[in-house]
Amino acid sequence: MLKKRAVTVVAGLTVAVLAACSAPQTPSVSSVEGDQAAVAASGSKPNIVFVLVDDLATNLVEYMPTVKAMQDEGASFENYFVSNSLCCPSRATIFTGRYPHNTEIITNTAATGGGYYMFKGRALDQDTFATDLQAAGYRTAMMGKYMNEYQPGSPKKPSANNPAGWDEWALAASGYAGFNYNLNQNGEVVHYGRAEQDYLTDVISERGQDFIKRAAAEGEPFMLELAPFTPHKPYVPAPRHENLYKDLKAPRVASYDKKNKNAPSWMASQKLTGPRKKKMDEQFRQRVRTTLSIDEMIADVKAQLRESGVADNTYIVFSSDNGYHMGEHSLISGKMTAFSTDIQVPLVVTGPDVPAGVKVEDLGSNIDLRSTFGDLAGATVPASVDGQSLAPLWSGGTNDRQHLLVEHKGMEVDKMDPDTGIFRSPIPPNYAALRHRDWLYVKYNNGQREYYDLTSDPYEMNNIVGKITKKRLLTLDRLLKDVRQCAGQEQCTHAHAEPASVSELRQARRRAKAKADELLEESTSPSATATPSPSASSTPLGAGLPSAN
């Protein structure tokens, strides 16, 4: 559980009284109430601008000067991962704060187990961070990409599927090419053509800035999500950027064009040919070019916040729905794996109480964004969410999370799906994975497994699952089973608790017993009162320690 800042939840949680050797203390209720009083005294809740991009790998941040400046100005999460490295399942998780096994959105289309119509059909659109903030008095707006299969309608017949939780919106469906799309603007559909000013990222940037200007002028706290379709395939940059970086190549990292040792069967036949490498280099150049307009959008939004006088009271959050691989592990362009290329994405936050240049090492996930936004806004977040607020982490707090879950459903190629219909990269079969800071464990439904020691093998090249003990494997399988069934913040956090080794348990219990004996001796000394110490009498030995089972 996170320390320092508590998310408001519908159901109360029981707080365990820990032994003297337990985790750092949380602040008192009065200190939290003091923070809330300070916000109230200022007369304004903080605003939030959330920039969610599509398929952006961490290696693209290097080409985004505004985002790099945000890293210097605020907090960067060094171990932030998505729960599914595919667009729609990840976005469903971001909206709801729940793992894919709880949203049941596991693919991009209704035909295969996901998409907008399933999201809406399960009433998940009524239960998101947008509805939380709207209920807390926020003015909300979303621009760009919503969910796969969402349709805006046509100018003559606008869609009646207005997104719940959003006061304003400007949403497209087929915006991947950047031009020639319909945009549903608050129920009115406008067609944008192929003129330079019709480039989708620029259009949503302008509309977002206009929203900020109006909301700030009216003194309303606001949540704005800007969700460009880039750098997703087909990687179309703004015309002003299309001739830049002519000599750039996809990064030749240690795993580039290298086959994994003891790779699972779905990877065995992969090979990078000369033409494929050349094609990927061009694709990488295009991806970099598409990020330039995103970076400019963020710079323009920051300028508008300053002009509107609300920059000092606004959080800006930058992230991606998933990552992307280009040549690593001898795989051609794609995603959906459990490798870091696909599941580790940027999360950068600036705002009123975010110290400059903070690097957060604790594990974070896209299940956490809903709770984080609720925390910042003082909104009520349901206890049924799986995530927890990340806000305490940039102020020196910690969490006790040890692992994160990654889920994936292997899919048949669907020509209507932008993530499978145009893919040539192999799609992994069904798997579930545990991501730790120091290792990665993947279990496929066909029985194959992978285990990578990230301390000695940071590029995830040597699958050593055959070298770990049977006991360790059973422990990993039990952990994986537990977290795949978890629901709610408490369960999903503590389902991750890995048993310590027997020797570690014995040492910890000896320390706990010694502390208890010391407290008991103090309580029975002549100078002590007749009432036993609560720490010694009511706390069982080993309280708060992991089970050895």
Where do the PLM segments sit?
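A short aromatic-rich beta-strand->coil structural motif
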Residues: 48, 54, 133, 145, ...
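Active-site-proximal cap/lid insertion segments
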Residues: 35, 39-43, 58-59, 173-200, ...
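Active-site segment of extracytoplasmic enzymes that catalyze sulfate/phosphate-ester chemistry
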Residues: 50-51, 58-141, 152, 174-175, ...
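C-terminal cap/loop subdomain of S1 sulfatases and analogous C-terminal strand-loop tails that border
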Residues: 164-176, 322-328, 355, 367-370, ...
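C-terminal motif of bacterial Sec signal peptides marking the signal peptidase cleavage site
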Residues: 17-20
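Short, solvent-exposed turn/loop segments enriched in Gly/Ser/Thr/Pro and often Arg
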Residues: 57, 63-64, 76-99, 106, ...
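Long, internal low-complexity/basic segments
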Residues: 22-25, 32, 43-46, 53, ...
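Non-catalytic, well-ordered alpha-helical segments in soluble enzyme domains
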Residues: 130-139, 205, 209, 299, ...
